[in-house]
Amino acid sequence: RSENTRKAYARDLLDFCQTIYRTTDLRKALSRFLSLSEVEAGMTLTKFRQLLRERGAQPATINRKLSALRAFVDHARKRGIVNWRVTDLVKGEKQRTDPKERIRQHLPAVTAEGIAEALRKVLDAFPERGLQSLRDKTIVALMALHGLRRVEVARLSLSDLIDEPDGVFSLRIWGKGDKFRVIKLVAETTKLLKRYLAALKRAKIEPKQDALGVPVFVSLRKSKGKRLTLTQLNNIVDAALAKAGIKRKGLSCHSLRHCFGTLAATSVPIPDLAAYLGHSNIATTGLYAHAVNAVNPADAVSELVLEAA
């Protein structure tokens, strides 16, 4: 599993320990949990699910936390520590909305035209000059015009930039499970990225190499030169949405990816879009819409968002 998945599981296990055993001592609490009989474990898991409901947790959140516990117990079961399974003891929550409806809840509008207009507002909200503005606009463009995940933007290193003969960049994208794909940027995003890198050099800010390489997007103040964190990317996108006047609950970094997928699916074959987005399951891509006419997904979206401006 990816590092982010492992961290998410650790947070969910910690929540379980704090909620049930009132402690942050993971080792002690989880050992106690694994010592329970099958009946006791079932009662404990049911109690945890009920407390999450009372807390107001969404079905998807409850299911994710139960999934973390299931993975942990399955590992213990393989080692002969327990002989019961979470799956047999507690049921997950039923999703109240279908997957397509969940995507719609994270979109800024209900029509393709409205979504394109919202993305234009976000991209137009950035000042033309300034290193921070260039950095942040480039980040938003990669998510909105190319459908990159937040973690994919964070992991971009200079070695992932491919300068094509026609002057545009292609990017080597490291997605879930350390799988990579190569996508071609549109001219406008390439221009933004080149301007940002040039401005970074003029400001004499040296990106600091880490385990992933030399980062593309770095902090400009505290921890200057270090790779931006996922939290920092959240803050950048939230600020951009607020400046554009469209920020509300449910809109986030991933909303920009949903916008890209929804717009691209109006004119791009699902298999092409799945490859561009890095979906291992084509059914996930199919949630966005039905497709026609084979074109570059990024070209389709940039035409809707940029050329109509």
Model-predicted segments: where are they?
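Conserved catalytic core of the tyrosine transesterase superfamily
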Residues: R1-A309
